[in-house]
Swiss-Prot record:
Chief place of localization: cytoplasm
Function comment: Catalyzes a salvage reaction resulting in the formation of AMP, that is energically less costly than de novo synthesis.
Name of the protein: Adenine phosphoribosyltransferase
Subunit structure: Homodimer.
Domain of life per record: Bacteria
Record's keyword annotation contains NAD: no
Length: 184
């Protein structure tokens, strides 16, 4: 078995990302990171890069967003030596919960964390997700973390889709992006 060698995480993303035209709607090119995450060498480089930045940002916890943020966030937290917060979509946790609603193109959604059993007061959280597009989900996660008494010390994503305003929306803390979208 040949193990691919990549110069860095950016090269791994560029080599392994799958582009799917007209998904989820005509005119959109979906950038599927599944092959990137499935490649052990690529995944390792990405986790190392995100963990290095999480430590630089002073993370006490990594906040992984449902669902791919769970995969990335867990590995990053392990590597950085922090705890992991699984920031869930509404309805996945038993009550009581902290909840933060946010707008979608066609409605609303919410993110939740348990209201009991977590000691987040005065802690620093780095939020981790796979893709930054409009920034709506990460912004809602920030508000949720703040409602729990913690501070978001930074955001870390694998891929940023340029031109959708996500970077501007998240201007309250440092943003780490490994690779910009190739289709922007």
């Amino acid at each position: 078995m040949t193990v691919p060698l990549y110069a860095d995480a950016r090269e791994a993303i560029a080599c392994k990302t799958r582009f799917v035209p007209d998904f989820p709607v005509p005119g959109v090119i979906f950038e599927d990171l599944t092959p990137v995450l499935a490649d052990a060498a690529a995944f390792s480089l990405i986790v190392d890069e995100l963990a290095k930045n999480a430590m630089r940002l002073g993370a006490d916890f990594i906040g992984g967003l449902d669902a791919r943020g769970f995969l990335l966030g867990s590995a990053v937290a392990y590597k950085a030596g922090t705890g992991i917060l699984a920031i869930r979509k509404k309805g996945k946790l038993p009550p009581p919960v902290h909840s933060e609603e946010y707008s979608l193109e066609y409605g609303t959604a919410a993110l939740e964390l348990p209201a009991e059993g977590l000691e987040l007061e005065d802690k620093k959280v780095v939020l981790v997700d796979d893709v930054l597009a409009t920034g709506g989900t990460l912004d809602a996660a920030r508000k949720l973390i703040e409602a729990c008494g913690a501070t978001v010390s930074g955001y870390a994503v694998v891929l940023e889709v340029d031109g959708l305003g996500g970077r501007e929306r998240l201007n309250d803390a440092p943003l780490v992006v490994i690779n910009e979208s190739a289709t922007a």
